[in-house]
């Protein structure tokens, strides 16, 4: 056997040392067994001594103890590696699940966005359609109202033409009416008739009578109506109905006096007209 120094023992680990001792003792046992078998030396006893057997047993026990410790360490290491691997796999799986969830969330958001966009487009199309329908309805209403407005305007124009001017005009200032202007021009044309002596026309009163004067007054009231005068003026000759007032054909009107050519302004000192040249 080769002696072991302390330095070499410290340098070797226990597992190697125990293994070397086991090999050494086993070699010694085999050598003694062979010597006994071939009986080269009759003094050699069979088997080991008690001390040798005890040393070999201790070494084997320690060796197996180290193997068990190593086995436990390896098992622990394997368990740790397995746990790390499982944790890595679980983390990877978790990341994959998160990635899948993220993709699904993005897909759902895209679908929701597309749906909102589609709904917005449908709403815009609906609003546009409603706007077009409203425009069409407005156009139809305008087309329907336009003939009515034209008809109403024509009716107003027709009413304006057939309405007296005094009834249509509305001025802030006091303007003389057509009747007043006509009366003033009549007075200025014929002068003052208050001083005229109408005793020469007594024959007319006798011929006509009081009833004729009443009819004349009624006729004048009718002539003073602007609407009747306006209608009579614009109406055709065949449409004008001359009222029958019962006056005879010899009844003289103001137009008859105008036809005589009397100068109403040529009066004498007593404000009397000179009718000598006329045969009445």
Curated annotation (Swiss-Prot):
Query: For the region Disordered, what residue ranges are annotated?
Result: 212-247
This protein's source sits in the domain of life called Eukaryota
| Annotated InterPro entries | Mediator_Med2_fun (IPR021017)
Q: Which UniProt keywords apply?
A: Activator, Nucleus, Transcription, Transcription regulation
Q: Where is this protein primarily located?
A: nucleus
Of the GO CC terms on this record, one is: nucleus
Q: Where is the composition biased (Polar residues)?
A: 226-236
UniProt subcellular location: Nucleus
Q: Does the keyword Nucleus apply?
A: yes
UniProt KW Nucleus keyword: yes
According to the record's subunit comment, the protein's assembly and interactions are: Component of the Mediator complex.
- Which protein family is named in the record? Belongs to the Mediator complex subunit 2 family.
Q: What does this protein do?
A: Component of the Mediator complex, a coactivator involved in the regulated transcription of nearly all RNA polymerase II-dependent genes. Mediator functions as a bridge to convey information from gene-specific regulatory proteins to the basal RNA polymerase II transcription machinery. Mediator is recruited to promoters by direct interactions with regulatory proteins and serves as a scaffold for the assembly of a functional preinitiation complex with RNA polymerase II and the general transcription factors.
In Swiss-Prot or TrEMBL terms, this protein is called Mediator of RNA polymerase II transcription subunit 2
